[in-house]
């Protein structure tokens, strides 16, 4: 291109003096360089960083951000193709290979698909790409498995066999409110309103909501708090000094051990949440109210808890068909 500038200057030599020709050449070179700067293409890593920043601003939890990041990083490292050149065929092949190599369930692969789809949809919305390659890759069909809940008898067994006031209070609060274990361990004593039997929890994306507990839970919570000798503001703390805030893993381990000791199948915090939701729906609570209590943004998520109890089906059949 510099040769063309020289050619222009030479053609103007007949009408311009030396000083003017020199100035013309400077102006042409300057403007040419400014207007023809080649923009450096955005790297795949940079696209991912922009996406993660956007999700952070939207209020996604640290756990969700980490899952997005690890999922998409793995995909980009395996594909080794600039994002703008990634096609639907490439993505299908990646998902097939992922399932074969890891021998994972269809549910796991669909979770991966959903995360990657969110990434490309965001790129499309932000005009970084023309069309998401995930548009034609639909939800992977999985087997509909009816997940078990904790029976009334099992709940009473768990209560009766708690070795500490803390564990009894945890079981009552989980069963009564249906809160997530992550919400449980973040609770402070100050969050509990004993008069109204309610508390404020911070759910996914730090969304605040109000949940309610029964009289039995109120009694056991008070007994546990009154028995403590520490000054920690946390509602639930470790059993021994220095009495740190209880962690998610601590709750999970404690419940799992108690369940095994009683020969109960798969006792974990989320099972109490599922049980509470199922019981509420069975007793006639409107699904919209259950959604509010559980803190679901989509009612479809709540509908997954509307498990049809086979015993109830049998009773209804005997009632109407006998």
List each model region and its residues:
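Conserved tyrosine-mediated DNA breakage-rejoining catalytic core shared by Y-recombinases
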Residues: 177, 186-220
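Active-site/catalytic core of tyrosine-dependent DNA strand-transfer enzymes
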Residues: 214-264
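Short pre-functional
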Residues: 73, 117, 168-182, 198-199, ...
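Basic, Lys/Arg- and aromatic-enriched nucleic-acid-binding interface segment
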Residues: 129, 144, 152-181, 205-207
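Catalytic-site neighborhood detector that most strongly recognizes the C-terminal catalytic loop/helix
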Residues: 38, 149, 204-205, 294, ...
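N-terminal core-binding DNA-recognition domain of tyrosine recombinases/integrases
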Residues: 30-39, 46-146, 227
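C-terminal catalytic core of tyrosine-transesterase DNA break-rejoin enzymes
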Residues: 172, 176, 273-296
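DNA/chromatin major-groove-contacting recognition/catalytic segments
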Residues: 22-30, 211, 223, 307-322
């Amino acid at each position: 291109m510099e040769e063309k500038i020289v050619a222009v200057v030479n053609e103007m030599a007949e009408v311009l003096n030396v000083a003017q020709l020199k100035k013309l050449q400077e102006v042409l070179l300057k403007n040419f360089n400014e207007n023809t700067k080649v923009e450096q293409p955005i790297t795949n890593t940079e696209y991912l960083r922009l996406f993660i920043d956007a999700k952070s601003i939207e209020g996604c939890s640290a756990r969700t951000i980490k899952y997005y990041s690890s999922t998409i990083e793995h995909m980009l490292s395996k594909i080794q193709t600039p994002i703008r050149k990634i096609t639907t065929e490439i993505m299908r092949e990646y998902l097939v290979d992922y399932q074969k190599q890891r021998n994972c369930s269809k549910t796991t692969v669909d979770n991966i698909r959903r995360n990657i789809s969110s990434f490309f949809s965001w790129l499309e919305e932000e005009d970084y790409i023309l069309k998401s390659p995930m548009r034609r890759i639909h939800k992977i069909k999985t087997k509909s498995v009816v997940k078990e809940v904790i029976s009334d008898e099992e709940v009473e067994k768990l209560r009766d066999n708690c070795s500490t006031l803390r564990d009894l209070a945890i079981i009552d609060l989980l069963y009564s409110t249906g809160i997530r274990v992550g919400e449980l361990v973040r609770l402070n004593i100050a969050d509990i309103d004993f008069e109204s039997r309610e508390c404020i929890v911070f759910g996914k994306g730090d969304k605040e909501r109000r949940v309610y507990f029964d009289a039995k839970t109120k009694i056991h919570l008070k007994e546990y708090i009154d028995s403590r000798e520490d000054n920690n503001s946390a509602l639930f703390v470790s059993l021994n000094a220095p009495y740190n805030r209880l962690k998610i893993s601590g709750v999970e381990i404690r419940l799992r051990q108690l369940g095994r000791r009683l020969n109960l199948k798969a006792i974990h915090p989320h099972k109490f949440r599922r049980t509470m939701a199922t019981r509420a729906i069975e007793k006639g609570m409107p699904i919209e109210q259950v959604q509010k209590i559980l803190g679901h943004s989509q009612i479809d998520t709540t509908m997954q808890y509307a498990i049809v109890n086979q015993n109830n089906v049998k009773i209804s059949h005997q009632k109407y068909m006998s």
